[in-house]
C-alpha cells in the first residue's frame, strides 16, 4: 500500500507542460462589450468631392431620381455642396475646391451599394429613358440579388440591388 500511495502522490504533483505563449493560436478580436455602440452613431452619410457640381447634381437628380435635401453656399452665394436623398439613403456631393492635393482622380476604388424594394428592371428602364447608361445589368447574382451598376460623371460606382 505504501508503494501505491507514493505513486499516487507522484502523479498528483506531476506538472503539465504548456505550450509557450508564442505558439498559441491568435486570439479572436476582443469584443467591446457594448454591442458596438461606443460611438452611439445614428447615421452615416458619405460625401463625394466632384469636379462639376452642377453636372453631378443633374445626374443624381434627373437620371437617378434623388431629391435635394439641403444645399451649402459660399460667401458669394455659389452652391458648393448638396445633400441628396432617395428613400432612406442620403449622401453629399461637394464642389472640389481645387486646393493642393484635391486634384486627384475621383471615384477610384469606391462603390456605393444600395438596396431597393423596387424592381431593378423598372429602375434600369427609367435610368436609361432619362439618358443614363448602365455599366451592367440587370443581372441575377449568385448571392441572391438582382442588380444594376452604373458610374456617375466623376467615376463613382453605384450598384442598386434587390433580393430575389
Regions found by a protein language model. Give the residues of each.
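Vicinal oxygen chelate
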Residues: 3-47, 58, 63-151, 161-164
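Short acidic-aromatic low-complexity motifs
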Residues: 49-54
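C-terminal catalytic core of tyrosine-transesterase DNA break-rejoin enzymes
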Residues: 154
